Design a protein with these regions (language model features):
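C-terminal hydrophobic helical "lid"/dimerization subdomain
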Residues: 276-280, 321-417
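N-terminal Rossmann-fold NAD(P) dinucleotide-binding loop
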Residues: 202-203
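Rossmann-fold NAD(P)-binding glycine/threonine-rich loop
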Residues: 292-310, 327
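Helix-to-beta-strand junctions that scaffold the AdoMet/dcAdoMet cofactor pocket
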Residues: 282-284
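Adenosine-nucleotide cofactor-binding segment
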Residues: 192-198, 210-277
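Glycine-rich beta-strand-centered segment in the early N-terminal region that forms part
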Residues: 21-36, 51-119, 161-163
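NAD(P)H dinucleotide-binding glycine-rich loop of Rossmann-like/cofactor-binding domains
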Residues: 61-68, 73, 102-196
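Glycine-centered, small-residue-biased loops immediately flanking beta-strands
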Residues: 191, 286-287
Length: 417
């Protein structure tokens, strides 16, 4: 099978000899991959890994799978084959994958020496997104979406509405990360928010906050291209290089709706200066959320910045099935706009060219490159497919506008009868 595979730190390469995945458990299905996004985690695995992947010569704790493995965990595709225990999905369905591998998935690998190992405390309590042995399909547990096909259990697959193109469907996983952060902080509609960092997660948080009824969103981002994109997606923007750190915080607090800081802040950058800004830009009793993945190093901040104003600081890790379902529902209802979501995609590349044409580009051109998605199955038809899908979306929008107009006319007629 063709794949862009991880062989170890600094060693990602294309192969056409990766082992073909097969159904083992009765509730598994085979997915023909259409698109799979590149995540910051994939870049860190290349430059600083292994993080979720096992060391070369070792196996993953959950699955006992070794390297090499196909990378990629932001995947969408079409069901190709179903096991005898699959109940709700059928061949031909468009699906997106929740790629977590946790204690509850051990049954899928009956030959693993850990198949009967006791579940960790978090999994026992239902918080599988913070499993002590957390791994990902495409990052350690098993091969992922930078390959032609993936096998996954049905409970990790969600049907995508027919009108959602599969390139946009590949954004559902990162959007679920953002949605989970909003759930974790118990976001209240009508509140205000500051997002620090306009990478894919920061931009996705704009979409999630809009869908959740946020009254005002400000994004702090130094890169011009990313600020422009954040504006297109409905946020006010600020360039933090315009002022020194203290002046930036004072300015951001002043432009919050109300003039005294934000109800919620979301740190999508993961730096000491952004953590402190996330806390200090809050109004009293506000909540700061960390979505960034940090290295294992210590930083300085003042606990009294939290205590004196009864602020809260919390982390958000991955997602659960609730978040995937909520994002898909928001797409169905139009609360997440497909065209706005598609702004996040700045490149489409075949997996053969994935290392130089995508991964290295994201590492070396990160200010102007946001989200690149890979395909194993489109073979040079990237631009044509994207153009066709844009036409489909425009036609869908036109039909919806016509329906709304007809409804308005009918309502007006009823009022005058």
């Amino acid at each position: 099978m063709r794949a862009l595979a991880y062989f170890g730190k600094g060693n990602i390469r294309f192969t056409d000899h990766l082992k073909e995945p097969r159904i083992v458990a009765p509730d598994e299905l085979v997915i023909d991959i259409a698109w799979c996004g590149i995540c910051g985690t994939d870049l860190h695995e290349y430059t600083d890994g292994p993080i979720f992947f096992p060391e070369d010569g070792h196996t993953h704790e959950i699955s006992h799978n070794p390297l090499p493995q196909a990378m990629g965990h932001e995947m969408a595709g079409t069901v190709l084959e179903v096991g005898p225990g699959v109940k709700h999905l059928k061949v031909g369905d468009k699906v997106v994958v929740e790629p977590t591998g946790t204690c509850r998935d051990r049954y899928r690998w009956p030959l693993s020496p850990n198949v009967d190992k006791e579940w960790c405390a978090a999994c026992k309590k239902g918080y599988y997104n913070i499993c002590s042995y957390l791994g990902l399909c495409g990052a350690g547990v098993q091969s992922g979406g930078f390959a032609e096909r993936v096998v996954m259990n049905e409970s990790h697959c969600y049907k995508v509405p027919d009108f959602v193109p599969l390139d946009v469907a590949a954004l559902i996983q990162p959007l679920a990360v953002c949605w989970h952060a909003i759930r974790v902080c118990e976001f209240k509609a009508g509140s205000t928010a500051l997002i620090i960092g306009a990478g894919p997660i920061g931009l996705g948080t704009i979409l999630a906050l809009n869908a959740a009824g946020c009254r005002d969103i400000v994004v702090s981002e130094p890169a011009k291209v990313r600020r422009e994109l954040a504006e297109k997606m409905g946020a006010r923007v600020y360039d933090p290089t315009a002022h020194a750190a203290k002046e930036s915080i004072d300015y951001l607090r002043s432009i919050a709706d109300g003039g005294d800081g934000f109800d919620y802040t979301f740190d999508c950058s993961g730096l000491e200066v952004t953590l402190n800004a996330a806390i200090q830009c809050l109004t009293f009793r506000g909540t700061a959320v960390n979505l960034a993945m940090w290295g294992h190093h210590k930083i300085q901040f003042s606990p009294m910045d939290i205590t004196l104003h009864e602020r809260k600081y919390t982390g958000s890790m991955c997602y659960t099935h609730h978040d995937f379902e909520a994002v898909i529902e928001a797409l169905e209802e139009g609360r997440i706009d497909i065209d706005r979501a598609r702004h996040m995609i700045t490149g489409r590349v075949n997996i053969e060219d994935g290392l130089d044409g995508a991964i290295m580009k994201l590492i070396n051109e990160k200010e102007s490159t946001i989200k690149i998605i890979l395909t194993p199955n489109n073979h040079g038809e990237l631009n044509r497919e994207a153009d066709n899908e844009k036409k489909e979306i425009s036609e869908l929008g036109r039909r919806k506008d016509q329906e709304r107009l007809r409804e308005s006319i009918n309502e007006a007629k009823l009022r005058h009868t």
